[in-house]
Design a protein with these regions (language model features):
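Glycine-rich phosphate-binding loops of nucleotide-dependent enzymes
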Residues: 1-218
Length: 218
């Protein structure tokens, strides 16, 4: 459920909040409570919710939106225009991005294709861990299926995908593990075969928890 604490967890994992307990391990390193800049250098990328407000730069074209993360990390300070375009073109092909020209405004793309540009932005930095918050928010059904396919493809390539969604169908399609939050705490850690609508609803509404003595009664 919205406000249960899942978004806040991803924010702590990306250095936007301080964690009071637990730890975040990535690529063999303890990343707990590092600042955002340091976490990004350990190949962690983040796609926040509401891409129009938090991810895209509407005044810039597609190519510049694609390269933003690399530039901010200092990975591509002197890259030639040709190399920029070649790199973008490869990601465009790999992600089946539908865009007329890399010079087109990012806002000329559909929601699904904007999201692909944002994902490509982090993949271009060699991100191994992707933190996604409602990755298909505001995207049509056909584009959602493409995003699902892309996430599964990335997982099969060895990427770690941690995503928050309010849609149970997305969890069933994409997740091999599901953490259910209730009032800022993890109420359940479900394996793939345990993920179903009824079980998730019981945990996310507090009717059932991992602690039987605290279960609520209907």
């Amino acid at each position: 459920l919205q406000g249960a604490g899942a978004s806040e967890l991803r924010q702590t994992r990306f250095g936007l909040r301080k964690s009071s307990s637990g730890s975040f391990l990535g690529n063999g390193e303890n990343l707990t409570n590092l600042d955002t800049e340091k976490i990004r250098r350990y190949h962690v990328g983040r796609v926040p919710s509401n891409r129009k407000e938090n991810s895209i730069f509407p005044a810039l074209d597609i190519l510049n939106n694609f390269y933003l993360a690399s530039f901010s990390l200092g990975n591509s300070p002197l890259v030639s225009k040709k190399k920029e375009v070649d790199s973008y073109s490869q990601f465009k092909k790999d992600l089946n991005l539908k865009a007329e020209s890399y010079l087109s405004p990012i806002i000329s793309l559909s929601g699904g294709n904007q999201q692909k540009v944002i994902l490509a932005r982090w993949l271009h930095t060699d991100a191994d861990i992707l933190l996604l918050d409602n990755p298909t928010q505001g995207i049509d059904v056909g584009a959602k299926d493409e995003i699902y396919h892309l996430l599964l493809k990335l997982a099969n390539q060895g990427k770690t995908i941690i995503f928050h969604t309010l849609e149970l169908g997305e969890i069933r399609k994409c997740a091999d593990r599901c953490l259910v939050f209730y009032h800022g705490t993890i109420a359940a850690d479900l394996k793939r075969e345990e993920i179903n609508d009824t079980t998730v609803r019981l945990y996310e509404t507090g009717v059932k928890t991992n602690y039987p003595e605290k279960e609520n009664q209907l």
